[in-house]
Amino acid sequence: MRALSFSLFPFAFSLLLLSPAPATADITAFLGSNPTPSARLVKGVGVGVGLVIVGFEFEYAHTNEDREESAPGLWTYMFNGLVQTPVPIAGMQFYGTAGAGVFHETLNDVFSETNVGINVGGGIKLNLAGPLRLRFDYRVFTLQGSPLYSKPQRFYAGVNLRF
């Protein structure tokens, strides 16, 4: 009888892993800083869907140009994949992300570059109340073509609504 219960355990565990998990979606509105080459405000929105550990997100962000510092304006349109903790740990859900998309960079109505780019980063989502969360995110971009700054970085804080 004992051998039978041990042989049923792997089968039952496999069924648990193969059972469908509910998908979740979320939207994040954020403000942050792009310090490359000088600190400027970045604002944007991300919309995502998650399946327990894996998620996908489309994100739009805009950084204003600073003509006095010769810091270009930057628009990014990125599609990202996320790997995240399946459940919050002490009210926090950690994630890593990587993605690709299109960017547009301008400065002083003289310089303009549109091309593709990639990004990697990570962050944390903190549970507040119900579906409302705070999100903190850090990204490093690699911009192709001839941008003025090919490796901009970004840190943001945002309000995230899970539905």
Model-found features: residue ranges?
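Gram-negative (and chloroplast) outer-membrane scaffold detector with strong preference
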Residues: 48-118, 126-130, 134-136, 155-163
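Bacterial N-terminal signal peptides
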Residues: 7-18
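Sec/Tat signal peptide C-region and signal peptidase I cleavage site
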Residues: 19-25
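Subset of outer-membrane beta-barrel
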Residues: 34-38, 125-133, 139-152, 162
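Solvent-exposed loop/turn segments connecting transmembrane beta-strands
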Residues: 33-42, 66-73, 108-113, 144-152
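Positively charged n-region of N-terminal signal peptides that target proteins for export
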Residues: 1-6
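Active-site helix-to-loop segments that bind/position phosphate- or nucleotide-bearing substrates
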Residues: 29
